């Protein structure tokens, strides 16, 4: 039977609850416990699939095709465990489920209310994750901040949850901020005291406090927090600002987070094996020469819009013992000026996914520059589509070559809408989503990198390579190195006579892990490093 840990946040938003939950998951897994992590998001969207990246950051896609919060990416990367659509819950999805049940008559004519129906649905979702995953411990992160109106149903639900299970099967962790007041030279505990008071007023007494701070928390402050907040002294956990999110599990282990959590859950504190994780941190803190990577995107004002891409690059650099020198390049600025101006001194170019016309010509210009100047290049999703358009326009010289998404009247739509998408009107959850197989062709870079005949990658797209032009591309020197098993969909393309030029329709960044970088990103960094060494 599963045990349950609930992670709440206080004082300010974006305090790092997701990293704390993911780090605890890593620590528990290193002790031999199986873990699943669930995110409860208080917004009314059914999922983040239709939200602007500027509003929400990236949309993380699970194996079973759910469009979820980026925190699920942290959960997967830290625990190396695949999450499912059950691991992402929003207020919108809860209300949708309850209203659908009411329409079906499932409540036998009763008045549908927040309590017990909404809170009951939330509790049911948590139990469902436990039964589906068979995890020893289910960690649930509650989005938002204690005191927010929109979070109240979730907080009430996790209060009620303690009545569903045995007393020692539930633990509450509260992540909070201890601000440092520069003028007085003091760390203030009052905001945390008020946050815990607010949590208690709901009926939740936290078992552990994880205290974010940029200054060390002395024993006197810990005793003060212990006394005012009713938390065991050993359960006041210091969480100092870290040089990398990947060092957080080691810091929290030192502070005893996992040990105290297991004590609260009445579970054995088994021997901890973090040797591989410590090696990752060692390589991260002792990098070799820098690799200057340009990420050419349209949402670069918010780095979280490309979070998994950046982490995948970082994983590859850690494994290759290189320093990631990441340069954010606006595709629109390239349109205004030139690719040469922004990319003349980079070692690699990555063009990630996206939607719509804005910045596309800048991406295409970047790809042309990478192709002609022999700069290692990796295109992802829309990045592959732009690579196809670039080749069609500048090498094959097809008049008006484009994508039917970008130009519905194009006389040469080398990228077109998937046939099964033609009658779909709704936007949310209707793309080609989740894991699909891809068969790799012999004697290709793709086959060499993966060393597999069939791979499984995650997708999120409506448009695809137009097979009407396949032979034209092959005859002109393009290699189609990966397709769907039936050969109908082009999944991976590459160029010969180039140090590294690959583009894929899928999202390989979602499968990259610290210590296990994705082959395409590993290949990109390796090719960049080798090209640098040859130029010396």
Curated annotation (Swiss-Prot):
Question: Looking at its record, which EC class is this enzyme?
Answer: ligase
Active site location: 381 (nucleophile), 507, 509
Which of this chain's residues are annotated to bind UTP? 13, 188-193, 224
Residues involved in CTP binding: 13, 148-150, 188-193, 224
Gene Ontology, cellular component aspect:
cytosol
The EC designation for this entry is 6.3.4.2
Q: Where is the Glutamine amidotransferase type-1 domain?
A: 292-534
Q: Give binding positions for L-glutamine.
A: 354, 382-385, 405, 462
Binding residue positions for Mg(2+): 71, 141
Which keywords belong to this entry? ATP-binding, Glutamine amidotransferase, Ligase, Magnesium, Metal-binding, Nucleotide-binding, Pyrimidine biosynthesis
Q: Which InterPro entries match?
A: Class_I_gatase-like, CTP_synthase, CTP_synthase_N, GATASE, GATase1_CTP_Synthase, P-loop_NTPase
Record field: catalytic activity:
UTP + L-glutamine + ATP + H2O = CTP + L-glutamate + ADP + phosphate + 2 H(+); L-glutamine + H2O = L-glutamate + NH4(+); UTP + NH4(+) + ATP = CTP + ADP + phosphate + 2 H(+)
* PROSITE patterns in the cross-refs: GATASE_TYPE_1 (PS51273)
- Say yes or no: keyword Magnesium present: yes
The UniProt record gives the binding positions of ATP as 14-19, 71
Name the domain of life this protein comes from.
Bacteria
Q: Where is this region: Amidoligase domain?
A: 1-267
The processes (GO biological process) annotated in the record are: 'de novo' CTP biosynthetic process; pyrimidine nucleobase biosynthetic process
- NCBIfam families hit by this protein: PRK05380.1, PyrG
UniProt-listed PANTHER family: CTP SYNTHASE, CTP SYNTHASE-RELATED
Misc: CTPSs have evolved a hybrid strategy for distinguishing between UTP and CTP. The overlapping regions of the product feedback inhibitory and substrate sites recognize a common feature in both compounds, the triphosphate moiety. To differentiate isosteric substrate and product pyrimidine rings, an additional pocket far from the expected kinase/ligase catalytic site, specifically recognizes the cytosine and ribose portions of the product inhibitor.
> What's the family?
Belongs to the CTP synthase family.
- HAMAP family from the xrefs? PyrG
On assembly, the entry states:
Homotetramer.
Q: What does this protein do?
A: Catalyzes the ATP-dependent amination of UTP to CTP with either L-glutamine or ammonia as the source of nitrogen. Regulates intracellular CTP levels through interactions with the four ribonucleotide triphosphates.
Q: What is this protein called?
A: CTP synthase
């Amino acid at each position: 039977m599963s045990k349950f840990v609930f992670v709440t946040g206080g004082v300010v938003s974006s305090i790092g609850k997701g990293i704390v939950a993911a780090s605890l998951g890593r620590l528990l897994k290193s002790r031999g416990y199986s873990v699943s992590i669930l995110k409860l998001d208080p917004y009314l969207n059914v999922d983040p699939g239709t939200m602007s990246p500027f509003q929400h950051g990236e949309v993380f896609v699970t194996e079973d095709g759910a469009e979820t919060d980026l925190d699920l990416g942290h959960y997967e990367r830290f625990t190396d465990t695949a999450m499912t659509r059950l691991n992402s819950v929003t207020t919108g999805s809860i209300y949708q489920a309850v209203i659908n049940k009411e329409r079906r008559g499932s409540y036998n004519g009763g008045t549908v209310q927040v309590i017990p129906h909404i809170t009951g649905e939330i509790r049911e979702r948590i139990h469902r994750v436990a039964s589906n995953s068979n995890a020893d411990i289910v960690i649930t992160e509650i989005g938002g901040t204690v005191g927010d109106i929109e979070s109240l149903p979730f907080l009430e639900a996790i209060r009620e949850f303690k009545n569903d299970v045995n007393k020692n099967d539930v633990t509450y962790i509260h992540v909070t901020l201890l601000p440092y007041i520069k003028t007085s030279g003091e760390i203030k505990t009052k905001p945390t005291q008020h946050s815990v008071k607010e949590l208690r007023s709901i009926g939740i007494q936290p078992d552990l406090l994880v205290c974010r701070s940029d200054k060390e928390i002395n024993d006197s402050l810990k005793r003060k927090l212990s006394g005012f907040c009713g938390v065991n002294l050993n359960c006041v956990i210091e969480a100092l600002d870290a040089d990398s999110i990947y060092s957080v599990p080691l810091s929290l282990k030192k502070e005893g987070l996992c040990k105290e959590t297991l004590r609260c859950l009445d579970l054995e504190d088994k021997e901890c094996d973090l040797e591989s994780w410590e090696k990752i941190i060692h390589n991260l803190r002792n990098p070799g020469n820098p690799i200057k990577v340009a990420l050419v995107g349209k949402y670069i004002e918010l780095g979280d819009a490309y979070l998994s891409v950046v982490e995948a690059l970082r994983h590859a650099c850690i494994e290759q013992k290189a320093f990631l020198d990441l340069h954010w390049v606006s595709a629109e600025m390239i349109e205004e000026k030139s690719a040469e101006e922004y990319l003349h001194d980079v070692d690699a170019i990555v063009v990630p996914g996206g939607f719509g016309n804005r910045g596309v010509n800048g991406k295409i210009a970047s790809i042309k520059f990478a192709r002609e100047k022999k700069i290692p290049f990796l295109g992802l999703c829309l990045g592959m589509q732009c690579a196809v358009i670039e080749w069609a326009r500048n090498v094959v010289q097809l008049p008006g070559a484009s994508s039917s998404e970008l130009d519905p009247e194009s006389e040469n739509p080398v990228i077109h809408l998937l046939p099964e998408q033609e009658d779909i009107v709704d936007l949310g959850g209707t793309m080609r989503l989740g894991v699909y197989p891809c068969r790799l062709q012999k004697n290709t870079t793709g086959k060499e990198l993966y060393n597999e005949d069939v791979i499984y990658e995650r997708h999120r797209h409506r448009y695809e390579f137009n097979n009407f032009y396949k032979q034209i591309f092959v005859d002109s020197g393009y290699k189609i190195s990966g397709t769907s098993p039936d050969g109908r969909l082009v999944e991976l393309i590459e160029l010969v006579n180039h140090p590294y030029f690959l583009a894929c329709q899928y999202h390989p960044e979602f499968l990259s892990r610290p210590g296990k970088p994705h082959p395409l990103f590993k290949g990109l960094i390796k090719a960049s490093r080798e090209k640098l060494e040859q130029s010396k």
